[in-house]
Amino acid sequence: NKFLADRELKLICPVCGNETKGDQCDCGHVPTKEELAGSICVECGNKTIVKDNKNLYIALSKLQPQIEEYVSLHKNNWRKNAQNETDKYLKQGLRDRAVTRDLNWGVEIPVEGYENKRMYVWIEAVLGYVTATMKYCEENNLDWRQWWKESDNNKMYMVHGKDNITFHSLIFPGLLLALEDNYKLPDMIVSTEYLNFNDQKFSKSKGIGMTILDAIEELNVDTLRLHLIKNGPERKDTNFTIEDYKATHNEITNKLGNFVNRTLKYKGIETIPEGNMDTTFKDKIEKMYTNISEQVEKLEFREAVLLIIGFLDEANKYYDE
């Protein structure tokens, strides 16, 4: 005898055939109200029935021309999956999205007649970026407007998984545009594919994978950070295994650790002295620095790490020769 939020529903996705919650499938499909009509309650397993309900909506359909203009100006700097997913929804025509839910927890709605509703999490979550900036600036005697009002002095990067693309490329810009208060919109949409664990999707309920807290307790943090970037799912899903992590640890230990150790040990050096660097090798280092910086600016973090590891091979070769 209650209205259920989309996350409290489950159904079979008509696109990929997998079971999904009612808000969005892992394949990216957002169930329509017709598809939700045959859904099941996650809590009790009973089939749901459709009744009229009253919610507040953001009129994305009215904002589509402004959103399209924003996307056209920025999308060339986005990851390819973000470009494709965003273009797909714009081509279909943006649908108005409900911004309220029937829940007893969450951000309250300060609108008469909606006091028992709560804000949809992906509305308050993205607006939380602005709120967090305001809070930080308030505590540090700074002006939050220098980041969130139009400025040529900063760039805004939205980093997330591919299942959250539209919240950052369409809904968040739509919310800011609707405020009509000259807010800065995201410059870069940095959306990754999925990272799997031993060829399976991470799942807390099924006990597949490890939490980040477990990982930093059991593994070397520096190696873990390097491995996750080196093996990052930038263009396709990738797989995490302990064996691959160990291989990265051994690779960087051998190529960097041994190079530094044998160089200092060979000369009995405890501190690095002043000296003259081989001009040719210095030029290689400067070129490498430029190349890596360019890759980072293009959001090609994996390629940047591979350039660093590749240069370690050159450094070891230089030492041997």
Question: Where in the sequence are the language-model features?
Answer:
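Surface-exposed loop-to-helix/strand elements on domain peripheries
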Residues: 236-249, 287-289, 314, 318-321
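Acidic, turn-prone loop/beta-hairpin segments
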Residues: 271-293, 318-321
